[in-house]
Amino acid sequence: GDILEAPGPITIAAIESSSYNGRSGLGNIYTWAAGNGLEFDDNSNYDGWANNRHTIAVSAINHYGEQSYYSEPGANILVTAHSNGGFPVYQGISTTDITGSPGYSNGDYTSNFGGTSSATPLVSGVIALIMESNPNLNWRDIQNILVHSSRRNHANDTSWNMNGAGHYVSHKYGFGAIDAGQAVSLAENWTSSGTETNASFGPFNPGTELDNGVSTWTEFPVTVPIDIRLESVEVMVDISHTSRGNLDIVLESPSGHESWLSEEHDDSGNDYSNWMFGTVQHWDESTTGNWILKVRDSVSDSNSGTVNSWELIFHGVGNVSDTDNDGWPDYNDPDDDDDGWNDTIEISCDTDPLDNNSTPADTDSDGVCDFLDDDDDGDGFVDSEEGSCASDPLDNNSTPADTDSDGVCDFLDDDDDGDG
């Protein structure tokens, strides 16, 4: 539980590009083992591969349908699948083995495979069946189908809570045990998850010091005015702390449903330095309303910390305007019509920020539109003077003549040569 690790920016960009461009634009599918560190209080959200929204994080359950003794929880977990474990009767997973003595046994098979590394390929196999039944599904369709077809295992487990959209979801199991039959049945008639919409709020820079060893939360609220039906949420935090394992970090949605991003655990490492947490707990909830990031230092010791900055990034399907269809709603897009001009500047320049055929003129390409530029053609003469002097203010080859250089153009000068 004392390792916080994530892929670098090139790897993240490669995963994202593959999700959007693989399979001729439908996107490649990534499944990822949630992790086997439960006995060390590890959490899948401390793994930047497993909490990436383009991957499907998979936890493990035993043959009783209960959390395997090693399977890490996390707000990023989408589904769970069977693997080894169980008490009082232990049962492993049977699979092929390395031939001969180098394997788990002298034979070519083993009945003791396990871990989330066993649960994850089971999910991959079900996804293959889903894609076989409907080859036109994109990467978001696959995730949506898993959310809506998985079954609620171990129903009496207290980790199950209903989110604001009516889904039962668990930090141990995600949306439940994968169900091949239900998933394929749903996939056969699946049409579309809708056009993706993304919106960010922040970064906010509170610079707030955290009280040490208290049971009360330090809260950072933000009101979201737009309506996106959520799929995933990313939370970027920059928190200075000399023992980050002391911190509880929770995101609360307008419905009151909570994503536990980090819980107190044995990790004396420093800081969450621009760390990206991921959560799927709010799937199908609306973004509209008050969101709260809650942080507390629950250990009384000499370690202290400060919340330097944080940011919320929403992904889903928006009931919002997106004029240029770039996936970012106009509310969050500095250039709504994608014409290369900032909306605020367009308004100042008396052009339409929602029409990419309506762009500010900038004759001299100085970055100031003609509407606001005193010298449209950049010839050194103010436009109003050029108009008075019968020269063209939009042509820098047309400049007022001033033979005697007295500052009055010949057109208006009663004595052009200044000879009295």
Predicted regions and their residues:
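Extracellular S/T/G-rich loop segment that most often corresponds to the catalytic His/Ser-adjacent loop
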Residues: 48-132, 136
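C-terminal subdomain of the subtilisin-like protease fold in secreted/lumenal serine endopeptidases
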Residues: 27-28, 54-55, 69, 132-217
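Extracellular calcium-associated, cysteine-rich motifs in secreted modular proteins
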Residues: 319-420
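Secreted peptidase-domain scaffold signal
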Residues: 35, 169-171, 176-248, 306-320
